[in-house]
Amino acid sequence: MSNHLRYRYSRDKADRLGQVFTPESIASLLVESLPIPSQGVKQIIDLGAGQGALTKAALKRYPKSSAVLVEIDPLHVDALFATMPKNINIIKGDALDLGWENGLNADIVISNPPYGMLQLSDSINTFLSKTNLPVPTNGSWIRGDAAFVARAWMCSSRGTGLGLIVASPLVRDPSFRQLRETLINQLKGLCVTQLDTHVFDGAEVQAFLITGMRSTSRKRNVLLRKASIDGTIIDELEIGWGAAVNRLDFDYYNAMKRIGVSSSLSPDTLASVGTSIVRGSRSHNDFQRLGLDAFHTTDFKEFSEELLLKGCNHKYNVARPGDILIPRVGSRCLLNQARVVSGEGLFTESVFRLSVKERAREKVWRTLSSSFGSEWRLANASGNCAKHLTVQTLLGMPLIS
């Protein structure tokens, strides 16, 4: 099966395959986090082995074990043959294909999967069906790391240790809630470690280590950790099952702890009070070319509280008195908010309009303009370079009483 990026052209072969290579310090951290003692580990499987960093770290901790490395890139395969011990089995092929694992009995499965989108294939559909993992798909596409999680699951059984590196959607997006619940229930000693966004050379990604041992299904607490760029653990906390199925990122719960909000608190949300959230109809540049004024993220500094709008054009989305505007995108401006007190006007696609029933407006405004509202938006923003908020995420925002 060939891998494909979605929506853009790749810069090089590693980019086309969605590869980011694991630094030695992070490989060691992942292996050291596995709740599997060194005695009795006979076989390790490395899915999409790349340059072999994970296997090298695993062989240091489990020196009496053998390893099977599966890698699709012929250049990396040649390098692996040149650097790995002779008793290591290196398979040139796609880890997502079926058949190569026949006869293997893995004690540990490790992987740093590709982060791009992959087209669904017969083999992917087969192991998604066999594992019965609730992995979301988007039409004929699936996240690469999600596909590799399912593949690792198929290669494992009760007692097998799993060590995976995944991107942030699997850890915190609502669409992956059911998958998180399955992992939490069936991985004993589950630990999720948030990595520094600059840990991978030449890429800025928010990635996480997921480590645990497959076990009988039960509700469990989860250990969350934060690692520095060199793989040193700098902080940790434990959360309960109910919070964990919602999300598993350390920064979020640390922010909630810092501002004194319980992770298990379930107050009203923007959704429960009937909030409507829409983005602007055009970009800032588009409106400028049309000769139309539109409220943009750069305007929040000047109008931090109350807005008097003008320049209404009903061909596009319009903000009216009572509406609240917040930035949709922009790492530096996500803390801002403004409410319309007079007039009507346009707003750009970088801005969300929140329309709230009158009885709940003050509650929503009080929440958004509080320190909790700022911390919550920062903790829930997605993306790496340009942080952004989604409608689905915002609708789940809890409200201060």
Residue ranges and their predicted role:
Residues 74-76, 138-195:
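Conserved Class I SAM-dependent methyltransferase catalytic core
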Residues 162, 324-325:
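Generic structural signal for buried aliphatic residues
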Residues 1-83, 94, 172, 179, ...:
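Class I S-adenosyl-L-methionine
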Residues 198-321, 332, 342-346, 359-401:
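C-terminal substrate-recognition regions of SAM-dependent nucleic acid methyltransferases
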Residues 337-351:
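Short, compositionally biased
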Residues 82-100:
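S-adenosyl-L-methionine
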Residues 166, 329-330:
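Conserved "cap/hinge" positions at secondary-structure junctions
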Residues 30-33, 44-58, 93-97, 103-126, ...:
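Conserved proline-anchored active-site loop of SAM-dependent methyltransferases
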